């Protein structure tokens, strides 16, 4: 099982065993980290699951869709590491992926 490293807004780090096939958002939610709101439940329609992804994993992530890009444009905290965690599916190749929960807008 791949591991997902989640850093909260306060800098607290958790290492979570992630089931492959689940989205990063689902893994974080199922681990009880309630800082990630994910109000739409993973439908790519709210941007409340915004995370900053370790750039070392960029080549392993799927391309960003136009919808994801448009939603992230609405965030005051968007940067080059920004992704919506509902759009990232855990795979064995993503073992050790580190994401930091973005500040609330």
Curated annotation (Swiss-Prot):
Keywords: 2Fe-2S, Electron transport, Iron, Iron-sulfur, Metal-binding, Transport
Note on cofactor: Binds 1 [2Fe-2S] cluster.
Binding positions ([2Fe-2S] cluster): 40, 46, 49, 86
The 2Fe-2S ferredoxin-type domain, residue ranges: 2-105
GO biological process, one term: P450-containing electron transport chain
InterPro entries in alphabetical order: 2Fe-2S_ferredoxin-like_sf (IPR036010), 2Fe-2S_ferredoxin-type (IPR001041), Adrenodoxin-like (IPR001055), Beta-grasp_dom_sf (IPR012675)
Cofactor: [2Fe-2S] cluster
Entry's Gene Ontology molecular function annotations: 2 iron, 2 sulfur cluster binding; electron transfer activity; metal ion binding
Subunit comment: The chloroacetanilide N-alkylformylase multicomponent enzyme system is composed of an oxygenase component (CndA) and an electron transfer component formed by a ferredoxin reductase (CndC1) and a ferredoxin (CndB1). In vitro, chloroacetanilide N-alkylformylase assays in which CndB1 is substituted for CndB2 demonstrate that the two enzymes possess nearly identical activities.
Function: Component of the chloroacetanilide N-alkylformylase multicomponent enzyme system involved in the degradation of chloroacetanilide herbicides (N-alkoxyalkyl-N-chloroacetyl-substituted aniline derivatives). In vitro, functions as an intermediate electron transfer protein.
Name this polypeptide is given: Chloroacetanilide N-alkylformylase 2, ferredoxin component
Organism: Rhizorhabdus wittichii (strain DC-6 / KACC 16600)
Gene (UniProt): cndB2
């Amino acid at each position: 099982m791949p591991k997902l490293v989640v850093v909260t807004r306060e800098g607290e780090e958790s290492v979570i065993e992630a089931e492959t096939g689940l989205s990063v958002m689902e893994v974080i939610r199922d681990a009880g980290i309630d800082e990630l709101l994910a109000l739409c439940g993973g439908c790519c329609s709210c941007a409340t699951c915004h995370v900053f992804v370790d750039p070392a994993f960029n080549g392993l992530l799927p391309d960003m869709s136009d919808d994801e890009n448009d939603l992230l444009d609405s965030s005051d905290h968007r940067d080059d590491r920004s992704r919506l965690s509902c759009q990232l599916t855990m795979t064995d190749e993503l073992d050790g992926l580190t994401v930091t929960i973005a500040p609330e807008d």
